[in-house]
């Protein structure tokens, strides 16, 4: 599923340029993705799009985020640290952070890796057309391009 997300982020730099679900599914099938992977990815993205407005209190809160017991037990420690780091350095806002956590918790537990977290963050930022710091963008792109070689 995350291969489809990576493809979409690379193919459509602007989320609003994505075709509708039916056309997108046909294009993804033509590129070579399997139907079940396409279906899973489009459902996952649809859930991201369907997330409504959050309470204003959450959107404006400056309090640190404490993960729920379910999140602490369900997400690998490196994923927890990564998401909270992005929150702490204001690379994502509160709404984006909550969407990232929601989308990660919707993934099967065996797929909740650091690369999955990077791609989830990319998808959420892509959906919001958010500006991303160059160093953060480089870290996120590791999930697509692999680590940059040392020079």
Swiss-Prot record:
It comes from the Bacteria. InterPro entries: Smg (IPR007456). Disulfide bonds: none annotated. Transmembrane segments: none annotated. It holds the Pfam family DUF494. HAMAP family: Smg. Belongs to the Smg family. PANTHER family: PROTEIN SMG. This is Protein Smg homolog. The lineage of its organism: Bacteria, Pseudomonadati, Pseudomonadota, Betaproteobacteria, Neisseriales. The gene is smg.
């Amino acid at each position: 599923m995350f291969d489809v997300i990576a493809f979409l982020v690379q193919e459509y730099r602007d989320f609003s340029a994505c075709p509708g679900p039916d056309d997108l599914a046909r294009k993804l099938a033509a590129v070579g993705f399997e139907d079940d992977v396409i279906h899973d990815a489009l459902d996952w993205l649809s859930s991201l799009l369907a997330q409504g407005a959050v309470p204003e209190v959450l959107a404006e809160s400056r309090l640190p985020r404490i993960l729920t017991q379910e999140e602490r037990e369900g997400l690998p420690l490196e994923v927890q640290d990564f998401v909270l780091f992005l929150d702490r350095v204001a690379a994502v806002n509160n709404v984006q952070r909550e969407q990232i956590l929601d989308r990660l918790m919707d993934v099967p537990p065996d797929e909740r890796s650091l690369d999955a977290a990077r791609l989830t963050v990319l998808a959420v930022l892509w959906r919001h057309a958010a500006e991303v710091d160059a160093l953060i963008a480089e870290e996120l792109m590791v999930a697509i391009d692999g680590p940059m070689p040392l020079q």
